[in-house]
Amino acid sequence: MSEAFSDFEVIPAVDVQDSEVVQLVGGERGTETRYGDPIDAAKGWVDRGASTLHLVDLDGAFEGERVNADAFESIIETASVDLQIGGGIRTVDDAVELLELGVDRVILGTAAVETPEIVADIPDQQPGSVMVSLDAKGGEVVVPGWTEGTGLDPAEAATPYEALGAGANP
């Protein structure tokens, strides 16, 4: 590994839609390529040496609630690596439930943009257990599921979250 990337970690993503691993083109619904079972995909990444997995409930991102919880709970129960989950986490209860199940980091997007205080409202956070994801398209933050522009500049929008307790690393 080169000196420049000595602290660099590749984190594979397992994006789930309709209970299957998918890849969307440009975050657009209807453009997906399907890759099969999320549990098998997660296991495959772990078997290849991944130390962290990035799990995304794409249905949750689009619909505003956790949809693929069963698949993710199976991954949480069996994966022996750090897990970060996003997509459809809109309430403190959603975040707390995932952290209590053993997720290392919850990722808040739409909920954090619409109600920044949610970051501070998640009780008993461990350092780094809450991450804010600001998705941008066309130079502005977009929510939910990358469908609506907010008019917010991504760099300016990011400013308050660290003070509220969000962070990528413990």
List each model region and its residues.
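Haloarchaeal acidic low-complexity proteome signature biased toward cell-envelope/secretome components but also
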Residues: 1-10
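Hydrophobic faces of well-ordered beta-strands that scaffold small-molecule active sites
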Residues: 10-14, 53-55, 83-87, 106-108, ...
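Short catalytic helix/loop segments, enriched in acidic residues and glycine
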Residues: 28-46
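Non-catalytic positions within long, well-ordered alpha-helices that form the structural scaffold/packing
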Residues: 46-49, 96-100, 162
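Catalytic cores of alpha/beta
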Residues: 78-106
